[in-house]
Amino acid sequence: MEQKGSMLLKVVSIIMMVGGIIGAVASFIGAVLAGIASAAMAQPEVSDAVNSALAAEGYSNSTGPVMAVIWIAVVIAVAGSVVEIIAGVKGKKNWDNPAAAQTLMIFGIVCAVLSLISNILFATGGMGVQIVSILSGLVIPVLYIVGTVQLKNQA
């Protein structure tokens, strides 16, 4: 008996749901830490000390822009986690429905793009390049997209 649907899509969808939940928790922690940093930077003595340290390294008055980039990255990471959870749920539900393949493919592409943007912003904001995050943020959505192509080819 020939199997209908994409087992790859089903498995990767479950991984995406779990990853999305972990990402949401990590994003929440990131938001808390960014909030603490923002509150600390609101204190003139802290802000002056940080600006002095950055100026000594050649970065003058850059704490505001750095914090803005970090906050934007946190918002995008939260959005990415939500999209990843939704994509996982929809993929798990529709792993054997070729009519849903196009919509699922769009979810996979959006997940990959949001992950890439978030990683670029974190690196730009001084958080460093997170190779594991970049790879997992791209490999899983690419596998999800491959699963949607398998599903679409069954139509």
PLM features: what roles do these ranges have?
Residues 4-40, 63-154:
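Membrane-embedded alpha-helical segments of small multi-pass membrane proteins
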Residues 39-63:
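Membrane-interface interhelical connector segments
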